[in-house]
UniProtKB/Swiss-Prot annotation:
This is ATP synthase subunit b 2. The lineage of its organism: Bacteria, Pseudomonadati, Pseudomonadota, Gammaproteobacteria, Methylococcales. It is a single-pass membrane protein. It comes from the Bacteria. Its main location: membrane. Belongs to the ATPase B chain family.
Amino acid sequence: MDLNPSTFVLEIVNFLVLVWLLKRFLYQPVSAAIEERRRQIARTVAEARDTQTAAETLRMQYESRLADWESEKRQAREAFKQEIEAERQRALDELEKALDAEREKARVLIERQRRDMESDLERQALRLSRQFASRFLERLAGPEMEAALLRMFGEDLAAMSPEQWQALTRALEEQEHPEAEIASAFPLKPESCAELTEMIEARTGRAVAWRFREDPALICGIRLRAGHRVLAANVGEELKFFADGAENSLGGG
């Protein structure tokens, strides 16, 4: 076909009109749709990233919480274990104290029973020894032994200290009419009685009303009683003194 200027201009105009139409009715809507789609995709990606970040944060929080929970469980188990151990130790300590107390009570009881048994045996031995000594001395007792005890009594009187004589003198002075008693297991000879009474009256400076009597409980020997003062040299009272002293010693132990 022939290309003339007017046709060329017309083609250009048609082309420009077509371009305008395409741009107006096709390119702009498509561009707008593409831009909207791009923005939607960007929003979706941003939301996905936010979701991923939130999920990662939640995951980290969950893992941290799990770690904290495990730590708390370990601490709780350790605390519970320590509490159980402390309670067990406390129970063991209380049991040990109770056992110690029971052992001490048993020891004290056994010791008391042992001491009581020993005391009973010693008392029995003392009673038997006293009975044996009494029977033995009763068989040996007689005027000869009593004469020996009387001499010993006289020697003891002669050897008394001034303080002892003063005590005997006061015992006589406390009486309105001084009296004294001499008891013996066997009858005393008159000269022996006179010797004793003269010594006492001379040393005390007092005239005394004397009584003489026999007392088989003395077994053998003599006893002088002046007021509250008693002087003796006899088997019976010596045995009683020995037995009473031993009993008191056992009772005090």
